[in-house]
Amino acid sequence: MAGPELLLDSNIRLWVVLPIVIITFFVGMIRHYVSILLQSDKKLTQEQVSDSQVLIRSRVLRENGKYIPKQSFLTRKYYFNNPEDGFFKKTKRKVVPPSPVTDPTMLTDMMKGNVTNVLPMILIGGWINMTFSGFVTTKVPFPLTLRFKPMLQQGIELLTLDASWVSSASWYFLNVFGLRSIYSLILGQDNAADQSRMMQEQMTGAAMAMPADTNKAFKTEWEALELTDHQWALDDVEEELMAKDLHFEGMFKKELQTSIF
């Protein structure tokens, strides 16, 4: 038999639930604009820009080569994939993985990430836990097992309380992870207000900071271009155009009426 249902005071909604939502939302908004002010443009070398443009040209050739004559397609393909002196064969780039010890820019970016992500979460989370501790704020609309009690009832140690109830501290963390759709609606898809996404990026920052291997990209593009054959897409375009009823007479009448009025 289920125990008696809890009845929360309406003042909890006004002085605990809504303030936590508003504070979390505006902290995310401030974090977004502070991140924009602190972000630094990544400088690319001339070699990196040139390599990226070459890969784009090869990809465009594979996708749209059917709209140019076969000889033009083979000439461009020969420039990239010539077995002896083709660009993808003769070009070898030296990949040097960056190190925070030798790269001050990478170290600065890591410090900026800590300032805009970790520090606000510690300060705001600690302040909310101190100010609104001990409150039961809301209840999820479905039953949960006892394994969810440590996650949803931080700061409340009641063994008899149903696991569906949410404490004030847990309500803050639910807002941190649950407001991402609101941030995307207001600030766009790629925003710095989503703290959960920034935490994931910070955890995988070392892997993301590793540069892409240009030699592997050249090899992959060489294989893809090598398998691409020329398929002339404009073979019967003249016959198809002449076979269509273009209705030029009606178009000329419409233009004449427009010019008169």
Swiss-Prot record:
Its main location: endoplasmic reticulum. It is a multi-pass membrane protein. InterPro entries: EMC3, EMC3/TMCO1. GO terms for biological process: protein insertion into ER membrane by stop-transfer membrane-anchor sequence; tail-anchored membrane protein insertion into ER membrane. Keywords: Endoplasmic reticulum, Membrane, Transmembrane, Transmembrane helix. Residues 39-114, 188-261 are cytoplasmic. Residues 2-14, 131-168 are lumenal. One of its GO terms (molecular function) is membrane insertase activity. It comes from the Eukaryota. GO terms for cellular component: EMC complex; endoplasmic reticulum membrane; membrane. It is found in: Endoplasmic reticulum membrane. The chain crosses the membrane at residues 15-38, 115-130, 169-187. The keyword Endoplasmic reticulum applies. Belongs to the EMC3 family. Part of the endoplasmic reticulum membrane protein complex (EMC) that enables the energy-independent insertion into endoplasmic reticulum membranes of newly synthesized membrane proteins. Preferentially accommodates proteins with transmembrane domains that are weakly hydrophobic or contain destabilizing features such as charged and aromatic residues. Involved in the cotranslational insertion of multi-pass membrane proteins in which stop-transfer membrane-anchor sequences become ER membrane spanning helices. Component of the ER membrane protein complex (EMC). This is ER membrane protein complex subunit 3. It comes from Bos taurus. The lineage of its organism: Eukaryota, Metazoa, Chordata, Craniata, Vertebrata.
